């Protein structure tokens, strides 16, 4: 009997040892996971940033992956055309081309969400209207209505995109706009450390879901579209400036107790669009506290950065700002290398003991 008990005890001891070993391994692995929470208003560039992580630190986009975006590119183009044609009417801008109304009727009868090609008459109508001086005037006034940042990029390259053998490039994929709904996670590994990037919808209707992502966040990455200083929030009933909306949201986020121990990385995104826009739309016309020169993108972006950083006066943690262009892979690779090193240094003792 004693021999039997002894054998059972030895078996139980081996089982307990194995369980403890697995628990220790799981605990060690958990410490090697870094959770990065991407926040910001709608269209600030969060989803594009995720795509860049896939390109830089993941498997990238194969030809087959890119082909899956083909219809989305077509839909983005048609949605942009619909937005401009509706705005042309609302802004009472006249077309120059005598055949413009025929092209307008053809395009407005199409449903962007079902688009699978841009052939024949559709392509010709888009090309003619994009060349029309009235549509070009409407495009120049795009801050007065909602229009995708990728509109000019796609329409200027219409011959390539409308060809029968069209395969979207990686840049085409990066510029596709699909509103984020729900919670999307993208894990990737760097030096045996798992970075789990969490992207949530930025529209007002999506923000109530954010709280479900707030546990165990290593760093909050807040994206701001700095080119939106002269644009109005489409979701709002009143005319809310999109930059003001972003400032209010940032203030709310850094005040949450969940993030007291999290670093705050501020990505001041769309610096390329800001550089172009300040040449004809002046920051002082929308933010009277701006005291820099007109047509100076460096002064303008530094002023916007100060608006956000100054919100931090009541918070003990630091904010780490970076100017970015989310569609520029080299820029994002450089910036994220800096951010990654900062995150690893800040959390080195709890994330990777002994490193």
Curated annotation (Swiss-Prot):
According to the record, the residues making up region (G2 motif) are: 172-180
Please give the biological process terms from Gene Ontology that the record holds: adenylate cyclase-modulating G protein-coupled receptor signaling pathway
Lipid link (S-palmitoyl cysteine) located at? 3
Asked whether the keyword Transport is assigned, the reply is: no
Q: Which UniProt keywords apply?
A: GTP-binding, Lipoprotein, Magnesium, Metal-binding, Nucleotide-binding, Palmitate, Transducer
Domain (G-alpha) spans 32-355
Q: Where is this region: G3 motif?
A: 195-204
Cite the PROSITE patterns for this sequence: G_ALPHA
Q: Where is this region: G1 motif?
A: 35-48
Which amino acid positions bind Mg(2+), per UniProt?
47, 180
UniProt similarity note: Belongs to the G-alpha family. G(q) subfamily.
**What function does this protein fulfil?**
Guanine nucleotide-binding proteins (G proteins) are involved as modulators or transducers in various transmembrane signaling systems.
Its name, as the record gives it, is Guanine nucleotide-binding protein G(q) subunit alpha
């Amino acid at each position: 009997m004693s021999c039997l008990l002894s054998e059972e005890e030895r078996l139980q001891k081996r089982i307990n040892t194995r369980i403890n070993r697995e628990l220790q391994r799981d605990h060690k692995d958990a410490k090697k996971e870094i959770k990065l929470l991407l926040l910001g208003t709608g269209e600030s560039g969060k989803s594009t940033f995720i795509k860049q992580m896939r390109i830089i630190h993941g498997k990238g986009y194969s030809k087959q992956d890119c082909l899956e975006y083909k219809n989305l590119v077509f839909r983005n183009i048609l949605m942009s055309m619909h937005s401009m044609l509706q705005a042309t009417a609302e802004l009472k801008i006249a077309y120059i081309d005598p055949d413009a109304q025929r092209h307008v009727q053809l395009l407005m009868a199409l449903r962007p969400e079902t688009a699978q090609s841009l052939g024949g008459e559709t392509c010709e109508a888009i090309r003619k209207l994009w060349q029309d001086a009235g549509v070009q005037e409407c495009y120049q006034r795009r801050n007065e209505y909602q229009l995708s940042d990728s509109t000019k990029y796609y329409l200027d390259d219409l011959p390539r995109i409308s060809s029968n053998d069209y395969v979207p490039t990686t840049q085409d994929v990066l510029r596709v706009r699909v509103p984020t709904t729900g919670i999307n996670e993208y894990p990737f590994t760097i030096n045996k450390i798992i970075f789990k990037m969490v992207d949530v919808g930025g529209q007002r209707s999506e923000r109530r879901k954010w709280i479900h992502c707030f546990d165990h966040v290593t760093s909050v990455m807040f994206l701001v579209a700095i080119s939106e200083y002269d644009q109005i929030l489409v979701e709002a009933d009143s005319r809310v400036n999109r930059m003001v909306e972003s400032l209010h949201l940032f203030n709310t986020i850094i005040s949450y107790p969940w993030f007291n121990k999290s670093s705050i990385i501020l990505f001041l995104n769309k610096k390329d669009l800001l550089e172009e826009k300040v040449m004809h739309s002046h920051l002082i016309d929308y933010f009277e506290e701006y005291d820099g020169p007109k047509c100076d993108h460096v002064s303008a972006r530094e002023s916007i950065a100060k608006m956000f950083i100054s919100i931090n006066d009541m918070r003990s943690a630091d904010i780490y700002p970076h100017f970015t262009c989310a569609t520029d892979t080299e820029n994002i690779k450089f910036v994220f290398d800096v951010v990654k090193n900062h995150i690893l240094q800040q959390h080195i003792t709890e994330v990777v003991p002994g490193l």
